[in-house]
């Protein structure tokens, strides 16, 4: 966990939670500091990837202002072709950004972690592909439609209790509602 304190000194609002034990599920209230953390990582990625990264965006639940989320920052990186990222695997590794097998079809997946505490997921996707479009559309749709965000939040919270020790099943349990919300977003 990354813990940062603010000027108020209040213990309750001074801990920024980033990171979660691999394989587990715990949702926490949205924290404004997630955006700043994402921007810092995006800045590093821009420096490391240069023009290969056509766009880099904070996505996933930590980028949706009104909902609970696993305290793992998701970042999507758009490239012309997935293969464009391959020459950067070693450079990224030197910055504690590790290639991870078993990603979603159509993307290359990296993680940032400290031991078994995972802090960031970095999704490399084609700029004109469905993956990029889905990440951006989903985030923007839920940020623009608070009632849909709350519906998704309620579903996630129930699923997190049910699958607290099985992140794969938790993720699989959300696919139907995510598909429904993406259909609405793309209408």
Put a short name on every predicted segment.
Residues 4, 9-57, 179:
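Helical scaffold of the NTase/Pol beta-like nucleotidyltransferase catalytic core
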Residues 124, 130-187:
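Catalytic cores of NTP-dependent nucleotidyl/adenyl transfer enzymes across multiple folds
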Residues 87-95:
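Short amphipathic alpha-helices in soluble, non-transmembrane regions
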Residues 97-130:
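Conserved catalytic core of two-metal-ion nucleotidyltransferases
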Residues 94-98, 187:
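Short aromatic/hydrophobic-glycine micro-motifs
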Residues 44-86:
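Active-site nucleotide-donor binding segment shared across nucleotidyl transfer reactions
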């Amino acid at each position: 966990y990354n813990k940062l304190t603010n000027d108020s000194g209040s213990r309750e609002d001074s801990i920024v939670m980033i990171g979660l034990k691999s394989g587990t599920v715990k949702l926490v209230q949205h924290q404004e500091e997630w955006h700043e953390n994402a921007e810092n990582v995006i800045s590093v990625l821009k420096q490391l990837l240069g023009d290969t990264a056509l766009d880099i965006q904070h996505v996933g639940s930590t980028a949706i202002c009104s909902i609970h989320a696993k305290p793992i920052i998701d970042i999507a990186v758009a490239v012309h072709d997935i293969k464009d990222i391959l020459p950067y695997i070693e450079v990224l590794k030197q910055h504690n950004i590790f290639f991870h097998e078993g990603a979603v079809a159509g993307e290359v997946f990296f993680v940032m972690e400290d031991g078994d505490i995972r802090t960031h997921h970095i999704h490399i996707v084609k700029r004109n592909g469905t993956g990029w479009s889905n990440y951006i559309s989903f985030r923007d749709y839920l940020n623009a439609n608070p009632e849909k965000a709350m519906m998704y939040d309620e579903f996630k919270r129930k699923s997190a209790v049910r699958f607290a020790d099985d992140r794969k099943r938790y993720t699989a349990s959300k696919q139907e509602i995510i598909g429904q919300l993406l259909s609405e977003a793309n209408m």
